[in-house]
C-alpha cells in the first residue's frame, strides 16, 4: 500500500515570507439548526472553489452566512447538489466559488488561509507536469496591494477515505442521523482506514475529518523534487 502523509502549513516558511491572504468564498450553504440533535452548527473543510452557483435562481440565498432550520438547509442543499462532485456530502457551511478578498506581501509556493490551500499558478503547473493525480486549481478573486502580483489558485481538495475507528474515542457519539454532525475532535495520533483510501487521487481531505489534508507518497516526492515551499509532511499509519 502507498504511504500517506498529513499535509500542514510550514509555519516557519510562512513567517519568513511574511505575506498574508484574507477572504471568504463567494457562496456557502447556511448553517443548520437540527431538530433531532438540537445543535446549531456549521462545518469546516468542505470547500468547492470550482463550483459556480451564479446560474441558480436563488443565488442570493447562498451569499450570506447564517443558520437555518434543517428543512430549509436541506432544500438549499438539494439545489446545488447537481453542481457539486457526485460524492460530496455537502454539510452545513460548505463553501463554493472563488475566494474573494485581499493578498499582500510574498507567499510561499503553497499558502494557507486556515483550511484553504492556495498555490502559485506557475508552481502548480510545474507540479502537474510530474503527474500527481487529481490536482485541480481554481481561480481566486484576490486584490493585491502591489504591482504585477502573482496568480494564486485554490486547490479543490475533495473528501475521501476516513479516520480508522481505532483512533476515535469510544465515548464519541455516532453522527446525527438527520444532520450528519460528528462531534469529533482531531485525534492526537490519527490512523487512516486503509480500505477507504482512494487510489486515483494524490491530495485529498479526510472524509470524516475534512480539515485534515492527506497527500500520497507520490505527491510528497513531487513536492520535494521541485523544492516547493510552504508544506510540512507527517506520515500517518493505516489500518
Regions found by a protein language model. Give the residues of each.
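Short, intrinsically disordered, charge-biased short linear motifs at domain edges
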Residues: 14-27, 156-169
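Residues immediately within or flanking Cys/His clusters that coordinate Zn2+
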Residues: 28-31, 173
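Short cysteine-rich clusters marking metal-coordination/redox-active sites
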Residues: 34-37, 176-179
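Cys/His-rich microdomains that often coordinate metals
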Residues: 38-41, 182-183
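Short microdomains enriched in Cys/His and/or Lys/Arg
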Residues: 49-90, 188-214, 221
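A glycine-rich, hydrophobic loop/mini-helix early in the fold
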Residues: 84-106
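Short coil/turn motifs at helix boundaries and re-entrant loops, enriched in small/polar
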Residues: 117-124, 212-219, 223
Amino acid at each position: 500500500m502507498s504511504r500517506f502523509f498529513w499535509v500542514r502549513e510550514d509555519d516557519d516558511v510562512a513567517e519568513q515570507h511574511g505575506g498574508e491572504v484574507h477572504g471568504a468564498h463567494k457562496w456557502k450553504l447556511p448553517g443548520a439548526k437540527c431538530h433531532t440533535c438540537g445543535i446549531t452548527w456549521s462545518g469546516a473543510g468542505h470547500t468547492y472553489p470550482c463550483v459556480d452557483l451564479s446560474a441558480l435562481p436563488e443565488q442570493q440565498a447562498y451569499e450570506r452566512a447564517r443558520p437555518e432550520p434543517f428543512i430549509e438547509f436541506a432544500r438549499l442543499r438539494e439545489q446545488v447538489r447537481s453542481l457539486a462532485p457526485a460524492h460530496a456530502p455537502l454539510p452545513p457551511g460548505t463553501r463554493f466559488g472563488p475566494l474573494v478578498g485581499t493578498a499582500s506581501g510574498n507567499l510561499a509556493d503553497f499558502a494557507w488561509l486556515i483550511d484553504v490551500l492556495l498555490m502559485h499558478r506557475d508552481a502548480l503547473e510545474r507540479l502537474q507536469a510530474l503527474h500527481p493525480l487529481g490536482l485541480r486549481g481554481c481561480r481566486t478573486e484576490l486584490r493585491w496591494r502591489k504591482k504585477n502580483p502573482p496568480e494564486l489558485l485554490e486547490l479543490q481538495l475533495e473528501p475521501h477515505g476516513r479516520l480508522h475507528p481505532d483512533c476515535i474515542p469510544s465515548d464519541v457519539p455516532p453522527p446525527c442521523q438527520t444532520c450528519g454532525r460528528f462531534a469529533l475532535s482531531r485525534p492526537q495520533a490519527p490512523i487512516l482506514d486503509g480500505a477507504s483510501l482512494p487510489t486515483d487521487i494524490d491530495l485529498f481531505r479526510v472524509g470524516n475529518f475534512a480539515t485534515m489534508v492527506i497527500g500520497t507518497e507520490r505527491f510528497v516526492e513531487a513536492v520535494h523534487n521541485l523544492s516547493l515551499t510552504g508544506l510540512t509532511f507527517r506520515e500517518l499509519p493505516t489500518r
